[in-house]
């Protein structure tokens, strides 16, 4: 009785007439137990079986069965047969890069068309393209926040807002007057009147002393007339200017004469008025500050 071996199924269907000579040869009957073993036929069967495995592996397409890649059945394959690998995309070999765009929907492109992934622009470029769409309010807030930084820089322009400080030119252009607040010459001065008269006296003496020192310096320069650096150093070494201000009661008058009449500014009348009203007002008992409810009251002594 002729025995028929079952052919092992492969991924692809093998034509029927290709291996019929292997299974349906006249000598393919079962040998009797008493007959000697046929080594030549066994070797031929092993060779054909190996060739059949090679043909089956060549017909096997790994790309169609990627789910079973790396299984334990790979150990059964012949080591001499070269394996075919799927090409690795350049994006995987190049390391971390821009994120890949999602694939387009099925209805947008053709059935067999491979979607091409265009490289996305860097994040800085994307932010730069969206910057013009920001509202004007954010730009205004950014400018306001940048003002303290620009003010801290040494090269930043100074503020043009008017300040309460007086420049030296403004101080020299005023006429000086002592306070007229005391009602009579024997009345004691208040601290405010005393401070005001002190500033006026110092300003008058300073004006006259500066004028005398300037005139003395002009005379010394005209007498020596230096022409070189050595002459200037010699003049500086011997220069000694002593200023004596002895105007007496005409101190304020002589000081006011030194002021240019084109830029003269009278003393603020409000200052004198405040001093006069403070001297004429009767002394009032100062009021104690209001106490809070949580502060304990001091016991009466």
Swiss-Prot record:
> InterPro entries annotated for this entry?
Herpes_UL49 (IPR006908)
| Origin superkingdom | Viruses
Q: Where is this motif: Nuclear localization signal?
A: 163-166
Phosphoprotein: present as a keyword of the record? yes
Outcome reported for the amino acid change (mutating residue 220 to I): In strain: 17 syn+
Q: Mind telling me what this protein is named?
A: Tegument protein VP22
Where is the stretch described as Interaction with gE? Answer: 174-267
| Effect upon mutating residue 20 to G | In strain: 17 syn+
- Organism for this UniProt entry: Human herpesvirus 1 (strain 17)
Q: Where in the cell is it found?
A: Virion tegument; Host cytoplasm; Host nucleus; Host Golgi apparatus
Q: How does it assemble?
A: Interacts with gE (via C-terminus); this interaction is necessary for the recruitment of VP22 to the Golgi and its packaging into virions. Interacts with gM (via C-terminus). Interacts with VP16; this interaction allows the formation of a tripartite complex composed of VP16, VP22 and UL41/VHS. According to a report interacts with gD (via C-terminus). According another publication, does not interact with gD. Interacts with host CGAS. Interacts with host SET; this interaction may interfere with SET-mediated nucleosomal deposition onto the viral genome.
């Amino acid at each position: 009785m002729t025995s028929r071996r079952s052919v092992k199924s492969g991924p692809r269907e093998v034509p029927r007439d290709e291996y019929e000579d292997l299974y349906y040869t006249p000598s393919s009957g079962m040998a009797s137990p008493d007959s000697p073993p046929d080594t030549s036929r066994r070797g031929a069967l092993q060779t054909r079986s190996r060739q059949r495995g090679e043909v089956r592996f060549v017909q096997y397409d790994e790309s169609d069965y990627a789910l079973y890649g790396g299984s334990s059945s790979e150990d059964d394959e012949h080591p001499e047969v070269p394996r075919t690998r799927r090409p690795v995309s350049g994006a995987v070999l190049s390391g971390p890069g821009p994120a890949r765009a999602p694939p387009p929907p099925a209805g947008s492109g053709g059935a067999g068309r491979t979607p091409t992934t265009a490289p996305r622009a860097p994040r800085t470029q994307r932010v730069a393209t969206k910057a013009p769409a920001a509202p004007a309010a954010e730009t205004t807030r950014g400018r306001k926040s940048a003002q303290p930084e620009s003010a801290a820089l040494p090269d930043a322009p100074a503020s043009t807002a008017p300040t309460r400080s007086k420049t030296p030119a403004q101080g020299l252009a005023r006429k000086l007057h002592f306070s007229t607040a005391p009602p009579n010459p024997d009345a004691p001065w208040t601290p405010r009147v005393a401070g005001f008269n002190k500033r006026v006296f110092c300003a008058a003496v300073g004006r006259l002393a500066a004028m005398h020192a300037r005139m003395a310096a002009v005379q010394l320069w005209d007498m020596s007339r230096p022409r070189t650096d050595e002459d200037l150093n010699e003049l500086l070494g011997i220069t000694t200017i002593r200023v004596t201000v002895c105007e007496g009661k005409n101190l304020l008058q002589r000081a006011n004469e030194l002021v240019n009449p084109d830029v003269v500014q009278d003393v603020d009348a409000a200052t004198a008025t405040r001093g006069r009203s403070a001297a004429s007002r009767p002394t009032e008992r100062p009021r104690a500050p209001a106490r809070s409810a949580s502060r304990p009251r001091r016991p009466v002594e």
